[in-house]
């Protein structure tokens, strides 16, 4: 994500919505697009910070701003009115963006599913895996909030091609956690490769078990218990020469090193530990044929807490990466409204929320952005998705945090 510094004097007037998301120097979302920063306390807090926007959002805003000023000039407006000209907060062409993000991940899921079923040394398997990793990472970097929204929303509802979908979600969680831990790129690369392939030995079995209500048989349990070792063996036989990734796959269910300082362990062990936590979190929030999905808040207790019951180094980073209320999950606000989380906020408990249902149960015609830093709209509790019966358009929800650019959908693999 390439960021562009924003001067506080460039913030819109109190009665105008933000034309693009405001972020801090790390890229963390502070305030989503479409929100009016009318709260004076929040505005003063923002003015004390170094503010940034994604460069392509800012460049597009400047282009539209110049066009609006040119239009006023052509109309013969006074100079003060020309300077005050502003375009609409968000262009109409934004509507296609969320669909393209979801479609892109569905395509990547299908392609990873095919790769996981075709592991071997006598084909272009390693090249296809590497290209998938590159494409997936690029999509995550361009559309981090929308991608998390997609993974969480889909995980609690659908189990089709579970193994590939879970691999992509684990990669997203793990790589963002590693970034917060300050890992070198080579180790992050190994982590991503391990996330995509950790279950290669049981991909078909995982898909089957996710779709049935019956518990695993004795034989299936044996396959599950030995899959880490067998997956690592398949990767080595296929020629994967990233030793850290292969060893991390072998160790990704090993909890013996938990509780020890991360920096005292080998790179492979560090990768395995982060992979294990992301794997646990993603599995807990995913629906299976035999059980409902766990709430992200409950999943965080199992994935982010160390032996002493407190978030340890990895757990704290994972919690910051995903938030207590991740994008795509439903929440009830202090106002009594029910909404869906659109994007992570400045802290794990301060997401950007799109309110969908009023306190008296009336469905809003359009999603209403709520800044949970405002105590009136603080998150009260997580809401199970089965309790939310309202239908809504994802593109309108995601527009609240996406900024003004409608990005083209992902091109087919190999087209670059």
Predicted regions and their residues:
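Histidine/acidic-rich helix-loop-helix segments that form or flank divalent-metal centers
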Residues: 195, 235-276, 290-291, 302-348
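Helix N-cap / loop-to-helix initiation motif
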Residues: 38, 184, 241-242, 295
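Membrane-cytosol interface segments
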Residues: 1-128, 378, 383-416
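Acidic/His-rich, divalent-metal-binding segments that scaffold phosphate/diphosphate chemistry
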Residues: 80-225, 236-239
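Low-complexity, glycine/alanine/valine/leucine- and proline-rich hydrophobic stretches
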Residues: 36-40, 337-382
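Active-site-proximal alpha-helical segments within enzyme catalytic domains
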Residues: 224-228, 268-286, 293-302
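His-Asp-centered metal-binding catalytic motifs of divalent-metal-dependent phosphohydrolases/nucleases
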Residues: 188-215, 231, 246-260, 275-282, ...
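Short, solvent-exposed cationic patches
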Residues: 50-64, 290, 345-346, 354-366
């Amino acid at each position: 994500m390439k960021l562009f510094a924003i001067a506080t004097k460039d913030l819109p007037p109190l009665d105008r919505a933000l034309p693009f998301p405001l972020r801090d120097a790390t890229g963390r979302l502070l305030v989503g697009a479409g929100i009016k920063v009318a709260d004076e306390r929040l505005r003063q807090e923002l003015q004390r910070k170094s503010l940034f926007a994604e460069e392509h959002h800012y460049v597009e805003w400047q282009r539209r701003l110049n066009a609006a000023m040119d239009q006023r000039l052509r109309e013969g407006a006074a100079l003060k009115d020309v300077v005050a000209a502003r375009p609409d907060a968000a262009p109409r062409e934004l509507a296609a963006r969320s669909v393209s993000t979801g479609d892109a991940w569905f395509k990547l899921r299908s392609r990873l599913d095919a790769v996981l079923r075709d592991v071997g040394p006598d084909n272009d398997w390693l090249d296809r895996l590497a290209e998938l990793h590159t494409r997936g990472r690029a999509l995550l970097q361009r559309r981090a909030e929308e991608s998390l929204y997609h993974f969480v929303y889909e995980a609690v509802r659908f189990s089709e091609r579970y193994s590939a979908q879970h691999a992509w979600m684990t990669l997203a969680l793990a790589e963002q956690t590693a970034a917060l831990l300050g890992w070198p790129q080579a180790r992050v690369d190994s982590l991503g490769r391990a996330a995509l392939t950790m279950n290669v030995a049981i991909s078909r079995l995982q898909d089957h078990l996710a779709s049935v209500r019956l518990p695993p048989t004795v034989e299936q349990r044996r396959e599950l218990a030995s899959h880490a070792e067998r997956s690592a063996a398949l990767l080595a036989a296929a020629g994967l020469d990233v030793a850290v990734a292969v060893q991390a796959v072998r160790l990704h269910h090993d909890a013996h090193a938990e509780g020890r300082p991360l920096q005292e362990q080998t790179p492979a062990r560090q990768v395995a530990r982060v992979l294990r936590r992301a794997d646990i979190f993603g599995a807990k929030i995913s629906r299976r044929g035999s059980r409902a999905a766990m709430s992200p808040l409950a999943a965080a207790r199992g994935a982010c807490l160390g032996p002493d019951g407190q978030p340890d180094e990895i757990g704290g980073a994972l919690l910051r990466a995903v938030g207590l209320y991740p994008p795509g999950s439903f929440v009830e606000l202090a106002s009594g409204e029910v909404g869906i989380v659109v994007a992570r906020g400045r802290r794990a408990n301060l997401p950007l929320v799109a309110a969908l249902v009023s306190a008296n149960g009336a469905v809003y015609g359009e999603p209403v952005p709520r800044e949970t830093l405002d105590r009136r709209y603080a998150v009260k509790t997580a809401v199970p998705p089965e309790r939310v019966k309202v239908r809504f358009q994802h593109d309108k929800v995601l527009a609240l945090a996406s900024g003004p650019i409608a990005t083209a959908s992902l091109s087919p693999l190999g087209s670059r």
